[in-house]
């Protein structure tokens, strides 16, 4: 059996003056970037903005048919039912974009920019490895900008067609290069910082609706669905380049890192290893049936050639991700909104198994053949290997201002984590509260707790020094990774939002020998 020597790493000491100088410089850059984004986010003239005040659009509402996660791309929904408790006449709803979007247009042009500054204090660490969340003080800034464009070619209510094309740029870096945590602290961070910030095509989709009835229901037009009304019963098809969380595992209080929580395993189900490249996108198709109170959707999409890879495997016979979801819009409380979703996934890809990697390392065969000194799962990858799992997702309004939500996720855990993050089981509970009580109806407070876990084979792999695409401390004293996150999102003006956020991470990377860690964040967001 191979032996390992783990060198204790003391908590680094830093020159306070030097840290303050670097922090001030970084904050100055952040202010400059925010100012530039504000100038870029004013496509309408002053006259257009003044005229928009005379005829404000209706406040966006949670869609009765939430097949499209509009909240993820186009800002938050103001609740019209959040009446002022003082009994005064209702005020016009606030505008939540730099310029309003006409509901009857066949074109859609909008955008968003998101800047997140994160800093971490030093924390206890008995040792570090290649993929550790570093224990020294650190701060990083990430930037994401997206241009949403779409055209509605067939304006028939029963047979609507949308063509969607989005461009995106992601820059900056995450703390510790986004390594060392299963629930990383910033969803905007690209897991391969070497890709750079060059703009890329994020989405190209064809969206087709086939109505099954003449009866319609209204919906808020957005960048992924332009029709202001759709048939109550309908079939929808999408084909092209997408990101799966736009359509699956959507959750009103917990899906948007730009206006809500920032942690990977709070905004998405951490155990859902959904098909995606490093940036979070894939190519494929999906179908969806919608009725008044329920929906069912299914899609098949391309998988990457390697774990966390940017290149996709186009041989669908051996590599693909299948996803299905049932959604029931049934509230537990009268006159309040409530939704429950059941998700399943089954991925086939060039994956290895943790147990095989550990066994061949311990018996010396991998060391003799390949010269490796730790278990190496990539040496045991098999084409067509199957990884599967399921998820539960719920949200419920308790009052006009208060919503609670939760998730549970599980996957079989024998095959390597491949596309999203290294979680085999997750449990989440949280809530958000609108600021109507203090006359800030679009402001919001959020609080959530998520606890992530991995299976025994995965634990052993990390214990003997193996590396995943995110984790690897060189050793593992296993414990559940538990994260508490809280934020306040402040609506400054029109489409400008600022947020303060704090996260507490217990057992980072499932390691009881490290942590706990605190991460603070400041976020600037613009919708235009």
Q: Where are the regions that the model predicts?
A:
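Residue-level signature of outer-membrane beta-barrel architecture
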Residues: 151-155, 208-210, 241, 288-291, ...
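N-terminal periplasmic/intermembrane-space "pro-region" immediately following the signal or transit peptide
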Residues: 4, 20-23, 39, 43-137, ...
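Transmembrane beta-barrel strands of outer-membrane/channel proteins
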Residues: 113-119, 165-169, 237-241, 298-302, ...
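Outer membrane beta-barrel transmembrane domains
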Residues: 327, 343-384, 405, 412, ...
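Hydrophobic, lipid-facing positions within transmembrane beta-strands of outer-membrane proteins
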Residues: 107, 141-147, 200-206, 235, ...
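Short loop/turn motifs that connect adjacent beta-strands in outer-membrane beta-barrel proteins
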Residues: 97-109, 121-122, 150-163, 211-234, ...
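Outer-membrane beta-barrel "beta-signal"
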Residues: 203-215, 447, 516-528
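Surface-exposed coil loops of outer-membrane beta-barrel proteins
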Residues: 180-196, 200, 215-325, 465-476
């Amino acid at each position: 059996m191979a032996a390992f020597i783990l060198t204790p790493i003391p908590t680094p000491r830093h020159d306070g003056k030097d840290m303050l100088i670097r922090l001030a410089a970084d904050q100055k850059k952040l202010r400059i970037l925010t100012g530039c984004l504000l100038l870029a986010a004013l496509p309408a003239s002053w006259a257009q903005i003044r005229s928009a005040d005379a005829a404000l659009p209706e406040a966006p509402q949670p869609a009765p048919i939430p097949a499209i996660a509009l909240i993820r791309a186009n800002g938050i929904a103001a609740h019209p039912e959040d009446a002022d408790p003082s009994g005064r006449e209702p005020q016009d709803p606030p505008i939540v974009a730099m310029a309003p979007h006409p509901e009857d247009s066949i074109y859609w042009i909008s955008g968003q920019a998101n800047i997140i500054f994160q800093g971490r204090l030093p924390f206890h660490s008995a040792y570090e490895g290649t993929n550790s969340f570093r224990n020294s003080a650190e701060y990083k800034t990430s930037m994401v900008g997206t241009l949403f464009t779409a055209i509605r070619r067939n304006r028939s209510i029963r047979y609507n067609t949308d063509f969607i094309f989005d461009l995106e740029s992601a820059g900056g870096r995450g703390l510790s290069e986004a390594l060392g945590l299963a629930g990383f602290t910033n969803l905007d961070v690209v897991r391969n910082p070497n890709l750079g910030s060059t703009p890329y095509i994020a989405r190209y989709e064809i969206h087709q609706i086939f109505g099954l009835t003449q009866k319609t229901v209204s919906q808020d037009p957005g960048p992924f669905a332009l029709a202001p009304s759709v048939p109550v019963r309908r079939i929808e098809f999408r084909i092209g380049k997408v990101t799966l969380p736009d359509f699956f595992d959507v959750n009103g209080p917990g899906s948007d890192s730009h206006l809500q929580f920032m942690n990977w395993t709070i905004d998405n189900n951490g155990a859902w290893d959904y098909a995606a490249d490093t940036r979070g996108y894939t190519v494929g198709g999906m179908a969806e049936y919608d009725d008044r109170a329920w929906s069912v959707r299914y899609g098949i999409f391309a998988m990457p050639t390697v774990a966390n890879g940017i290149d996709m495997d186009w041989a669908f016979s051996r590599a693909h991700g299948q996803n299905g979801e049932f959604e029931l819009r049934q509230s537990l409380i009268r006159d309040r909104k409530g939704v429950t979703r059941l998700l399943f996934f089954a991925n086939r890809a060039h994956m290895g198994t943790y147990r095989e990697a550990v066994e061949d390392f311990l018996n010396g065969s991998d060391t003799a053949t390949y010269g490796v000194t730790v278990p190496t799962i990539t040496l045991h990858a098999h084409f067509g290997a199957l990884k599967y799992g399921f998820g539960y997702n719920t949200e419920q309004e308790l009052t006009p201002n208060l919503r609670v939500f939760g998730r549970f996720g599980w996957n079989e855990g024998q095959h390597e984590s491949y596309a999203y993050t290294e979680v085999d089981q997750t449990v989440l509970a949280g809530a958000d509260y609108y600021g109507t009580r203090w006359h800030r109806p679009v402001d919001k407070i959020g609080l959530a707790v998520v606890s992530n876990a991995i299976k025994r084979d995965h634990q052993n792999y990390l214990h003997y020094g193996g590396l995943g695409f995110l984790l690897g401390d060189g050793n593992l004293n296993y414990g559940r990774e538990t994260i508490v996150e809280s934020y306040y999102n402040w609506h400054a003006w029109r489409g400008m939002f600022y947020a303060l956020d704090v996260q507490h991470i217990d057992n980072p990377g499932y390691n009881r020998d490290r942590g706990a860690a605190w991460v603070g964040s400041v976020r600037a967001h613009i919708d235009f």
